Swiss-Prot record:
Pfam entry (one): Ribosomal_L5_C
Superkingdom to which the source organism belongs: Archaea
Gene Ontology MF term list: rRNA binding; structural constituent of ribosome; tRNA binding
UniProt gene name: rpl5
HAMAP family: Ribosomal_uL5_A
Name of this protein: Large ribosomal subunit protein uL5
Record has RNA-binding as a keyword: yes
Family, per entry: Belongs to the universal ribosomal protein uL5 family.
Length: 169
């Protein structure tokens, strides 16, 4: 039996669509994430100037939504992982979690093609943690998580296979 403080859990699931420009495409991406999650997405802004693409700092170029708690687990298990057939590359795993891309939103179960939206893909990133990680985020008496308590790539891969039924390719 595993110690309760060593139990791995989902901190958050972040869904991101990088459009690369503001305007109609950005509004479509915003609407897609709103329909998929039932939450209000936030627009992400450019940090650097890219002259060739007509991007300047502060210009909205993408949308993202962060899911936490039971809702994050439910959407990951019922919608996002079935869209990629529960298969994720080993190189997609890090010490903090794992990420994967969904080429077109119509691959997600329950999502129908909408001619107004067109075909849009999105990225999902799952951030994992153990109980006790709050010591790094709190404001008072902030501290570091010890190296033995910190997650590593092998533990995350094992957890994803057992808990979520993910196949590593």
């Amino acid at each position: 039996m595993e110690h309760p403080m060593r139990k791995i859990r989902i901190e958050k699931v972040t869904l991101n669509i990088g459009v690369g420009e503001s305007g109609e495409k950005l509004d479509k991406a915003y609407e897609l994430l709103k329909r998929l999650t039932g939450q209000k997405p936030v627009k992400t802004k450019a940090k650097v100037r890219v002259e060739q693409w007509h991007i300047r700092p502060g210009l909205p170029i993408g949308v993202k939504v962060t899911l936490r708690g039971e809702k994050a687990y439910k959407i990951l298990k019922e919608k996002l992982l079935p869209a990629v057939d529960f298969k994720i590359k080993a190189s997609s795993f890090t010490d903090r979690g794992f990420g994967f891309g969904i080429p077109e939103y119509i691959m997600i179960p329950g999502m129908k093609y909408d001619p107004e939206l067109g075909l849009i893909g999105l990225e999902a990133y799952v951030t994992l943690e153990r109980p006790g990680y709050r010591v790094e985020r709190r404001r008072i008496k902030r501290s570091k998580v010890g190296s033995r308590h910190r997650l590593n790539k092998e533990e995350i891969i094992k957890w994803a296979q057992e808990e979520l039924g993910v196949q590593i390719i």
